[in-house]
Amino acid sequence: MKASVFKSLYFQVLTAITLGVLLGHFYPELGAQMKPLGDGFVKLIKMIIAPVIFCTVVTGIAGMESMKAVGRTGAIALLYFEIVSTIALLIGLVIVNVVQPGAGMNIDPATLDAKAVALYAEQASQQGIIPFLLDIIPGSVVGAFASGNILQVLLFAVLFGFALHRLGEKGQLIFNVIESFSRVIFGIINMIMRLAPIGAFGAMAFTIGKYGVGSLVQLGQLIICFYITCVLFVVVVLGSIAKFNGFNIFKFIRYIKEELLIVLGTSSSESVLPRMLDKMEKAGCKKSVVGLVIPTGYSFNLDGTSIYLTMAAVFIAQATNTHMDVIHQVTLLVVLLLSSKGAAGVTGSGFIVLAATISAVGHLPLAGLALILGIDRFMSEARALTNLVGNGVATIVVAKWCNQLDNDQLQAVLSNKTLPNNEIKSSTSA
């Protein structure tokens, strides 16, 4: 039991952060020299931004069933995803502006590593909507991947996904190759995330050594602010949506409590995808709806990640005294409406998309990611839990709107009257 605790990434990161704080506090000069450890980890994350979003988007779109058969369901699902994700982004933006957890840190962006972000610094965005939209179109596909321009990669991925879907069986080989490549990419992410303790140690030691223990207070405020915001979003926003569609959000949370516990331990909503497919079908949602909404939602309906992205981006601006006027914040929202759709329900994806977003916006210092590197791991639980509840609610709502929901069965399982626990466990344990 003790060995498993020590091997836990959560424990390792927590220990690394503690050691980083102690080193930075008692030996500030030495702590400040640990900055390359955090910078190196950020560069590793940047390395796989483009391929992970390309694979996720392509397999998500190309893996859908017949467009004609599920056209209405897909359109309703995407409309729902866009509306609720936008609400999540706005809520995160409003609360971080009101609470201002990063105000007072007074971190000079010039002290952050410029070399670590040189690749993305070259992509400084031109002001104006027209240049911004034109810049989404790449000069070449290879150029989009080589430069790391995530919006260009995302555009190509969407077009590629639709084209691959139209090929049908003829494109199955290509689909299988990309899906296999996707597994390799996520395997790389898992390996990189094992280095998170080293990166967290370096980033935290540098932050405390350079700016003092007082900077840790603002980091704690960001974590608390984010968790409270996620709880409010689930209870108020998702709760209202659930009530409007005839079910209780708290009963639904109780229904998926086992899945929530798994996600809490893994920090990845993807870890319970097979279980969610099974449980949502047993909750009265037709299989065709469940098969479309749940997998698609893992890229297009990540409410917790949306809240995190706006809060983290503005926090970096506040901490580095980077002024963000209304135009800048609207631009941030527009970019996030696109880039957040490339996130995946795996640990670290939120941080990856945050890096992509900051690089695309161009106004914020990408090296500022080091400020939240040490605490990102501890916000991933709230992200994953909110994402999971959000996708479950979305499935029920879309099923109801498409007349593909057995409401009597839904009410029965939510009331714990006919919940087939044993069957669920046995069918999803493989």
Curated annotation (Swiss-Prot):
It comes from Yersinia enterocolitica serotype O:8 / biotype 1B (strain NCTC 13174 / 8081). The chain crosses the membrane at residues 8-28, 44-64, 76-96, 144-164, 184-204, 222-242, 289-309, 326-346, 352-372. Responsible for the transport of dicarboxylates such as succinate, fumarate, and malate from the periplasm across the membrane. GO terms for biological process: L-aspartate transmembrane transport. It comes from the Bacteria. One of its GO terms (cellular component) is plasma membrane. It is found in: Cell inner membrane. Keywords: Cell inner membrane, Cell membrane, Membrane, Symport, Transmembrane, Transmembrane helix, Transport. InterPro entries: C4_dicarb_transport, Na-dicarboxylate_symporter, Na-dicarboxylate_symporter_CS, Na:dicarbo_symporter_sf. One of its GO terms (molecular function) is succinate transmembrane transporter activity. PANTHER family: AEROBIC C4-DICARBOXYLATE TRANSPORT PROTEIN, PROTON/GLUTAMATE-ASPARTATE SYMPORTER. The gene is dctA. It is a multi-pass membrane protein. HAMAP family: C4_dicarb_transport. Belongs to the dicarboxylate/amino acid:cation symporter (DAACS) (TC 2.A.23) family. This is C4-dicarboxylate transport protein. SUPFAM superfamilies: Proton glutamate symport protein.
